[in-house]
Amino acid sequence: GGFTHIAFNSIALYFFGPVVERYLDTRRFTALFFGAGIVAGLAQVGSTLLTVGPFGPGVVGASGAIMGVLGVLTVLNPGLRVYLYFIIPMPLWVLTFGFAGFSIVAGFGAFGGGLAGGNVAHLAHLAGLVIGLAYGARVKGNVGVPNSQEFGRGGGGMGGPGGPGGPGRGP
């Protein structure tokens, strides 16, 4: 938890969100984001109630929503080149499943914090990812995915700066 966690969520949404929104559309992106966040948050709250009781840490679900976005993008464009920490190049699927593996080990492994996860909602991450992967598989044949994607412009979503209809671009 904490500021660093919020910062990484914000960075991920800034870079991945507009790309997924372009693939889906604003309405479906919004439904995915809130749906994955709500389901992920409920999964984490349920597991916390079962393992720690009613006095466990609270959860917002934003990480699950971000992982849902990442899951959809991984299904739609698994080979998309991304940069871990803005330095290490890798295909998106490696980043996604590497992060999922980390959440499994940190949340459930011998050195992890259990389902409470040391104030990180690891089950929410995983639940959001599963929702995103499933939704991506469902819409894969119905959305246009370009062979290559100009990536890293962030904020270029529908109507945003650099996006279709946004400032600096034609309609």
Predicted regions and their residues:
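A detector for small-residue-rich transmembrane helices and their helix-helix packing motifs
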Residues: 1-171
